[in-house]
Amino acid sequence: MTTNMLDLFIEEASEHLQALNDNLLQLEKDPTNGQLVSEIFRSAHTFKGMSATMGFQQVADLTHAMENVLDEVRNNRLAVTEHLVDIIFTCTSHLETMVSDIQHGGQGAADISKTVADLEALLHPEQETDTAVEKTYRIAIQIEEAAILKAVRAVMCLERLAEMGIISETTPDREAIELEEFEHSFEVVLETAQTKEEIEAVILDISEIEKVTVTEEVEEVQIIEPIKKAAKQTTKRLENKTIRVQLEKIEKLMNVFEESVIERARIDEIAEKTNNKELMEHLGRFSSISKEIQNGLLNMRMVPVDSVFNRFPKMVRTLAKELGKKIDLVIEGADTEVDKIVIDEIGDPLVHLIRNSVDHGAETVEVRRKNGKNETATINLKAFHSGNNVVIEIVDDGAGINKRKVLEKAIAKNVVTRAESTKMTDSEIFDLLFDSGFSTADQVSDLSGRGVGLDVVRNTILKIGGKISVESSENAGSTFRIEIPLTLSIIQSMLVATSERRYAVPLANVAEAITINPADIQHVHGKDLINYRETIIEVLDLGECFHETPLTDTDELLLLVVKNAKRTFGLIIKDIIGQREIVLKTLGGFFSESQIAFSGATILGDGRVVLILNLETF
């Protein structure tokens, strides 16, 4: 078995599993939809064939048992019930685990005996059934030459045949047929329990069909042919539209480009020092070209948030059943694109927030009825672009957050005093939820409420330059809003100097730079404040924040006014070096989770390493 074959199997298996889960969720809402049943059967059938071909026998056995049940449903001998859907979902969970095992070098081994027994029980084996044997037919269909809409007639034929069984091949392929890229005839390979006569009758019932020839095919067992065929079809499809590239290759290319940005910065400094205008002119043109390359590379790394969102419908369904709740998960903006690196970081925080909404937000059916609500709770998961950020919102119509309970817990843990609590805004109260170990759950549940979640969620979001906020109204619901950058690689920044070091400040956070008189600074309750455009803002000495010598002994101070998600404030600095496009490098294990004042570091043209401030932590 080659690595390419295994990679293709993993990729195809993941796609079929996602299709199974998506269609099962729809079937649960529309149990009489025969087309959905056919789609689910087709996915299971293909999965079985792929697994058997690759030698993963347990996977093949489980999908074969699934296929038997689905075939009974497809032929109206078994009804779609909640119990049946539950068992099929259990199967897909097993399959996900088995495919993961294969991906990590295993053989997909798992204890599936109980699940297979549950599937067999659905079939009532004690009752004799007259099940027709499926056969494979090659069907040649010829459309009348005078037909005006050949593609329409051909697609109608394909849809009718799909209702009768599994279409394993079309010549030409489906896309070419839909685009009318064929003469007057095409061929279909169909697996079905129907007879030749029944197939012919169905096709000839469609107008403008001139001739149908149905020939039974003898199936040849070939060990690797199905996978080769899939690879051939995939290659043909990709030649026309796309090409799949491993993320590692894009990362290597991006790293090389990032080095070129650093080298360009060095040449910029040389050009400035030598005042070489011709070199500066060429560098300007080179910068434009670099920008296009950068945009192209970043676009290659953009993936839809659906790659994370698609795991949640099944998760919410499972958790809701465990808790005896009725919950609808509504997803909006699943096609919103964001950097693959960012996507990889936000998966776990979103899992925790959605589990929180299911566990603490959504009420039981009885409580919702008592409060005059629809017995089914709704959780909305939304994604949309906002400037250079992607916004993700988790909105529920549940119980909301009890502010009094939050404050009492905070006072008990000495996070705030009772006097301070009386002056706190709603936003400040909800921010307490993100303190380490904070939880208002009456009892610890298996899902959440252990007080080890929301602080980790916030720290993860902050580490990627994002921010998180909460809005809530008791008995009306809560909204958790996450803003994350589109990409983490290259950012526009303002380079500033303190008494001892240089720092990079993301340009998106900078409002303006002004000079102030030290006498204008007022000391109130341990904070330094100034009047900025008729608003009182806090002033921080940036160097002093990192144990450097303060700059307050001068006659005039340079103040960089910056904004984060919560507030506007000022940073006292020694000098502004200038605006730079910088490459953001992560700090890895150099800083612990509690030291998140920096989102990363960069290398300047002169070789200096500069830390990049994460102003959301100030």
From Swiss-Prot:
Record Pfam families: CheW, H-kinase_dim, HATPase_c, Hpt, P2
EC number: 2.7.13.3
GO molecular-function term, one example from the UniProt record: ATP binding
Histidine kinase domain segment(s): 233-488
Keyword Cytoplasm listed: yes
Main subcellular localisation: cytoplasm
Domain named CheW-like: residues: 490-618
Name of the protein: Chemotaxis protein CheA
Gene that this sequence comes from: cheA
